[in-house]
């Protein structure tokens, strides 16, 4: 089967073919949300990101990309001891328990309002807390499919809202479709040199 070269990249040398095939979806989703949608700066060390559902596939990649390529203060959520340990091993500075109110968890850890909030699952469940805790003029991104999502409460804080769907470029043959090729090659180099999978 032929595949458009604009949506493929080099295989990381230290991954099997199966592992390399599996990392594409999570990697593109994490990268595009972090750098294309939220436009996270790679140089700003005064900002923080809260990643809800950080221990899953996309979250684990996003944490590592943020750790390797930005100076963000990375805050993640988990609820089990093993996922909390996993996130700490990946480099998350503070792990919040997403079974509790996230705004109260931030206060408990004396953390300021995050500039960026990413919801990888349970967005419908967490939306009220996200509205409450995000920094004014912050950026909110998500990947799941809530049945309904009222974003009007973000208006008073002028929070921008961003969807991420890694198939958008290929489905609509966007002008920047080649970016996925470049992203996958960059991440392949990172995996070979720094990121642990």
Question: Each predicted region: which residue ranges?
Answer:
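A general structural signal for well-ordered alpha-helical segments in protein cores
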Residues: 27-31, 127, 184-185
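Mid-domain Rossmann-like dinucleotide-binding core that forms the NAD(H)/NADP(H) cofactor-binding site
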Residues: 21-100
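Generic detector of contiguous secondary-structure segments
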Residues: 9-23, 140-153
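C-terminal substrate-binding/catalytic core of Rossmann-like NAD(P)-dependent dehydrogenases/reductases
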Residues: 153-197
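Glycine-rich phosphate/adenylate-binding loop and adjacent beta-alpha elements
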Residues: 1-10, 17, 23-28, 37
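Aromatic/hydrophobic pocket-lining residues that form π-stacking "cages" and hydrophobic walls in ligand
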Residues: 62, 130, 187
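Glycine-rich cofactor phosphate-binding loops and adjacent beta1-alpha1 units
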Residues: 41-44, 90, 94-162
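Structural detector of well-ordered beta-strand residues that form the stable sheet scaffold
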Residues: 9, 50, 75, 139-141, ...
């Amino acid at each position: 089967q032929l595949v458009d070269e604009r949506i493929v990249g080099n295989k990381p040398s230290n991954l099997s073919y199966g592992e390399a095939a599996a990392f594409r979806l999570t990697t593109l989703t994490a990268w595009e949300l972090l750098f294309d949608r939220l436009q996270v700066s790679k140089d700003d060390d005064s900002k923080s990101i809260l990643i809800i559902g950080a221990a899953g596939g996309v979250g684990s990649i996003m944490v590592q990309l943020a750790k390797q390529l930005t100076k963000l203060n990375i805050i993640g959520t988990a609820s089990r001891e093993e996922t909390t340990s996993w996130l700490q091993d990946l480099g998350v500075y503070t792990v919040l328990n997403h079974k509790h109110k996230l705004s109260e968890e931030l206060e408990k850890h004396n953390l300021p309002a995050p500039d960026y909030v990413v919801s990888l699952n349970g967005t419908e469940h967490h939306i009220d807390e996200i509205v409450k805790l995000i920094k004014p003029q912050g950026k909110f991104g998500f990947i799941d499919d809530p049945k309904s999502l009222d974003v009007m409460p973000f208006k008073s804080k002028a929070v921008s809202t961003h969807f991420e769907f890694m198939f958008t470029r290929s489905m609509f043959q966007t002008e920047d479709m080649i970016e996925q090729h470049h992203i996958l090659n960059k991440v392949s180099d990172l995996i070979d040199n720094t990121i642990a999978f």
